[in-house]
Swiss-Prot record:
InterPro entries listed in its UniProt record: Smg (IPR007456)
Protein name: Protein Smg
Coiled coil: none
Family to which the UniProt record says this protein belongs: Belongs to the Smg family.
Pfam families xrefs: DUF494
Naturally occurring in which organism (per UniProt): Buchnera aphidicola subsp. Acyrthosiphon pisum (strain APS)
Disulfide bonds: none
Length: 157
């Protein structure tokens, strides 16, 4: 399922954010590529639930909430988010890329993934996907994108 999310983000969501997608043909295309139908349906369901933030079905996120708090993770969350992942989330909060609200959306979306433990690289993708899809997080998305993809350009030799 996670591979499908990344594939969709790279090939459809990020590049064609304003284009309507036919889910039946998308499902067939993904199946033809080799993804399992169950994983396809799970990934599309995960994205549909995330899109609730975009359609304002769920109360909108306040992008200005900038209070830093310490998040106590549940046992299930700690199993899925290892120490590196939890540290990265805190790091993004300290950089003011994540707010309290977006942090909670990200954790909630991670808990919906059908994986046992998330690694740091996968977490970065999830954070990008969530910030891209939550209204009012455009600036945070661009900050994270620059941090992740332009980091090497900023190193002084």
């Amino acid at each position: 399922m996670f591979d499908i999310l990344i594939y969709l983000f790279e090939n459809y969501i990020h590049n064609e954010s304003r284009i309507s997608i036919d889910y039946d043909s998308l499902t067939n295309d993904l199946s033809d590529i080799g993804f399992q139908r169950r994983d396809i349906y799970n990934a599309l369901s995960w994205l549909k639930n995330l899109s609730c933030y975009k359609k304002n079905i769920i109360p909108s996120i306040n992008p200005l909430s900038n209070k830093i708090t310490i998040r106590i993770y549940t046992q299930e969350e700690s199993l899925k988010l290892n120490v590196d992942c939890r540290g990265f989330i805190l790091f993004l909060e300290q950089l003011e890329i994540l707010t309290l609200d977006t942090r909670e959306v990200i954790i909630e979306r991670i808990m919906e993934l059908d994986i046992n433990e998330l690694n740091l690289e996968d977490l970065k993708w999830i954070v990008l996907i969530v910030l891209f899809n939550v209204p009012g997080c455009e600036s945070a998305y661009h900050k994270l994108e620059n941090l992740l993809f332009n980091f090497k350009e900023d190193i002084i030799h």
